[in-house]
From Swiss-Prot:
Principal place of residence: cytoplasm
Modified positions (Phosphoserine) in chain numbering: S13
Known function: Lipid transport protein in adipocytes. Binds both long chain fatty acids and retinoic acid. Delivers long-chain fatty acids and retinoic acid to their cognate receptors in the nucleus.
Name by which UniProt lists this protein: Fatty acid-binding protein, adipocyte
GO molecular function: hormone receptor binding; long-chain fatty acid binding; long-chain fatty acid transmembrane transporter activity
Impact after mutating L87A: Abolishes export from nucleus
Motif (Nuclear localization signal): 22-32
Keywords: Acetylation, Cytoplasm, Lipid-binding, Nucleus, Phosphoprotein, Transport
Length: 132
């Protein structure tokens, strides 16, 4: 089910990430540092538990979850959110909710790449990863 995502991925391109972070409410200084980071994403599966770890010079974060089960998450910019991740059409779709707001993060395979689309209101950021 999630096996296509398993592995270590390195960021190779990022479009519109600053505008997305601004829409989410991330402060200027944090946006500048986070925007320069080139994170590796490590995805693993153990039974029905999926773990996504992001490692960069900016910050390391890790979430472990079961598909379709809501969990508490502290994001890289320190937002406390409720997240739920589902598998939809071969994509891992994450919805984060906090303070009456929500954002969607869709992770999908495209050939040998992992494409992450982050959407907040009308702002979309696309980040592309390749296997490390």
């Amino acid at each position: 089910m999630c096996d296509a995502f398993v592995g270590t991925w390195k960021l190779v391109s990022s479009e519109n990430f600053d505008d997305y972070m601004k829409e989410v409410g991330v402060g200027f200084a944090t946006r500048k540092v986070a925007g320069m980071a080139k994170p590796n994403m490590i995805i693993s599966v153990n039974g029905d538990l999926v773990t996504i770890r992001s490692e960069s010079t900016f910050k390391n974060t890790e979430i472990s979850f079961k598909l379709g089960v809501e969990f508490d998450e502290i994001t890289a910019d320190d937002r406390k959110v409720k997240s739920i991740i589902t598998l939809d059409g071969g994509a891992l779709v994450q919805v984060q909710k906090w303070d009456g707001k929500s954002t969607t993060i869709k992770r999908k395979r495209d050939g040998d790449k992992l494409v992450v689309e982050c959407v907040m209101k009308g702002v979309t950021s696309t980040r592309v990863y390749e296997r490390a």
